């Protein structure tokens, strides 16, 4: 009787185990723009993760880019942040960004400070657990309000990133933006100097339009000057005649892409 039972179990097992393996393999091979959520203090935040198609046939660990959107992409549908900036560049030419890209979304009337910043960290951490990622190649970039978020997250944990790229960003509070407040402690003295001290040798490439009518170009100029004065690893590009939307040119730049993916946390 025991022999019969064992034989029956062995006969069933091969039919069941491959099905489990196929299910797990399918989950691991999910690519494209994927919907995800995180919860912070009881509030749900939506985010998108872009996974290149080549991920499905690779066993490598992939670089990660955390992208922070601007004020115009705030909401709760989890999709607006994929229509402007880095996601647009990826759709135009996916080969330029061979990376897993994390794109969180903040609610209407929110900024990348406090709980929304925590949600960005949580989305990043959740992504690095879900996919094969390289902790030595984690990058941060954002535009406009997201550029402010880039400065904020980099100030909080500069050691987490291999490089950052704030675009048409601001460091000091922006009165026209509801909820905007200081991201550098007020007792730290000059905000730009304090930011530069905090970032140290973190590779930073700053972009801004010369005649930006929304965010004063002085914000990026002062940040670049402070980083240079502190012997930081900084590049600054100012688009002559450029307005607020210089992110399309930035993300389309082959030079920027090559620089970004060449950076490593371990080299600092």
Predicted segment positions?
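A domain-start/cap signature at the N-terminus of enzymes
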Residues: 17-64, 141-143, 185-187, 221-225, ...
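Hydrolases whose catalytic domains are alpha/beta-hydrolase-1, hotdog thioesterase
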Residues: 149-153
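Gly/Ser-rich "nucleophile elbow"/oxyanion-hole loop immediately N-terminal to the catalytic nucleophile
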Residues: 54-60, 109-145, 158
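The feature captures the conserved acid-bearing segment of alpha/beta-hydrolase catalytic domains
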Residues: 163, 168-251
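Solvent-exposed loop/turn segments at secondary-structure junctions
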Residues: 55, 70-74, 107-111, 144-148, ...
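Active-site machinery of serine-nucleophile hydrolases
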Residues: 64, 68-121
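Structural recognition of the beta-strand scaffold that forms the well-ordered cores
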Residues: 48, 64-68, 100-105, 137-141, ...
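Bacterial N-terminal signal peptides
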Residues: 4-15
